[in-house]
């Protein structure tokens, strides 16, 4: 029964994710349209917005993980480097029924781990040396199972797309606000009260939309973390391992 409820929650989350991504795309294009309107060519603004969303999404979808790993100077791990880490991830992959992700490590004292990629066939799990050094075997297995669940549940793809689209919304909103500094809205002064009201509505949306988008993103991310905890516990059959690991991570960060 618990397993069925978990699968139902994951399916429900995936449906909500699709709706949220579509909503973010519509918002980004709507803001682009309004930006074009300020410069008296709403259609061009919409076309530019569509191209911008497509380009940024493609870059993030196909290169986002490599950019993140490169930014953190992550090094790929082999069995020769850390046999237990590799063997544990291979075992969890079999239990989850997905291909074994690539494994990376970052020389960083702060205990952390994350999964990246666009799908289970193109995924990786990264841990810091700080995490590797303070975790015992059960705790490490719990953390890795949590990250494996993010891969299996396609959280990695969703969060990458949402992060990109939220970034696009922030950028377009910033362009809208800056356009008034550049004088882009001056030509609408002659359009009377209706034009002024529309511009005020647009400015309000440009200010509030990025904030709302980030809040929605954080709320959705938190829900996915809960589901990854539950899915990870199902993989290891040992929820205490992850609970102890999270306590260690929290204590380590409190000391910083």
Role assignments for model-derived ranges:
Residues 205:
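S-adenosyl-L-methionine-dependent methyltransferase catalytic core, i.e., the SAM/SAH-binding region
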Residues 1-29, 37-38, 43-47, 51-198, ...:
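Polar-ligand-bearing catalytic/cofactor-coordination segments
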